[in-house]
């Protein structure tokens, strides 16, 4: 109808995003007269696109995905604490003609850990593969949740060390950055409770695992932010070794649910959102997964193998 609220997803590309299916299902389940649409926009056009939102009486809210999350950070009027910490915006909320920038990636990640794996980070050690925007959101959320040690492993060691220093400085956590060939890395992986892949290694079915799977041990949780394919080589090898495994659909779902609540003030039907995601992917989660996991490729992965650029919605 003419009064329908419009919700948009900014990105480039956006054609294969699962967010429209998920959010439109949530709007319908909530009885909200609204439509969530993908809006492909180049970086040069993003400022004008954001400005157009201010003049829309029926603007309901927006998501931001690659490659615009960092640019969106500078285009909003105010920021949530999470967005300010991560340095990126994935959710935009209209507040009295002003635009509030939020980042739901980290909280979405934590919720997926709690809800789908009954995993509490407090007092546990974690290894993060990658050092880009996705790794930043994950590392910050784990540090704030009380993880005992966060080991950031990246091909470019300077990026890993820089992120570790930021987490230690801002949150007072115990984080270290290591290169892929650091002799300390194997033992850190063997002895951790959680391994998180935030890189794009695994998006292609021919990709090998991003680390040597012989380092994985029974009982640890191996979480790959990639959700398409639902089972990456890393998760497949982890399952063989008796690990608990998770893909990225959970994170995509929960970060989207948090965004919906910010826009509407209502909690969405997460079941309707989950069903829409699974239908959009067109395949079922592997039996080893605690629940359906991931979508466009990843919930929030870094686009360069073990280097990374930024998160994806």
Predicted regions and their residues:
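Glycine-biased, low-complexity coil/linker segments
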Residues: 295-296, 307-310
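Rossmann-like adenosine-cofactor binding region
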Residues: 173-245
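Glycine-rich adenosine-cofactor-binding loop
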Residues: 11, 101-106, 113, 117, ...
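Conserved S-adenosyl-L-methionine
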Residues: 144-149, 241-244
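NAD(P)-binding Rossmann-fold cofactor-contacting core
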Residues: 147-171
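Adenosine-phosphate binding glycine-rich loop
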Residues: 123, 221, 225-285
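Phosphate/diphosphate ligand-binding glycine-rich loop within oxidoreductases
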Residues: 2-119
